[in-house]
Amino acid sequence: MFIIIKSTEKKQYVNFAHGGFTMEYRIKKIQSKADIDLCNEFEITNYKWRNVYTPKVVGKMGFIPGEGIFAKMTCFEENPLALKTQDRDRVCDDSAMEIFLAFTEEGEKLSNDIMYINFEFNSNAKMYAKYGKGRKGRTFISEELCKECGCTVTKDEKSWTATVLFPIKFLEETCNAGKLDVGSQFYCNFYKISETPEIEHYGSFSPIGTETPNFHVPIYFAKAIIVE
């Protein structure tokens, strides 16, 4: 069953096939990172489970041929918790934003055991980034790849903005994305989180239908489509 919600920037589809709510995000093809503000905006509005507060988060994502998928996210919060200072640290204990991308191989059905990437970053621009099929036995990206992703953060008094690149070679060769171009489809979700009790919160772009906190559920991801 699908219900279309009209929008000036993107179409959203309600899909109850998996007992969840699936939306659609259109990833614009752009020429460079400088064009990211031309892309469609998404907003994290679905907060559930335990939330001490619910910060506003918006973002944009674009496809750069030959480079990869570039994303920009802004969280409107003052003095974000940022105790983690090394890549691979559990930044979800800080105030963190996250991007998950999932890919099915030809003939493979959507499930929670498909290939997906989780890039998680705090306002120190430190990343906890893994890939793999399903939640167990996931692999950290290499230090070299982490540098190539180039996570950066800028801050002001009321917000912080992160940018990150998902390199095309990593997506196409390691993550089963196939050759990416206009018309390519996969799955995505965007998150805001802290697991520290004093500021605990769990926000997502595409709603999640689990009873307990769990972002590792591709069946609830939004459909992503690369467009002109």
Task: State the predicted function of each range.
Residues 2-5, 15-228:
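Structural preference for beta-rich elements and adjacent junctions enriched in aromatics
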Residues 12:
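An acidic-aromatic pocket/loop used at catalytic or ligand-binding sites
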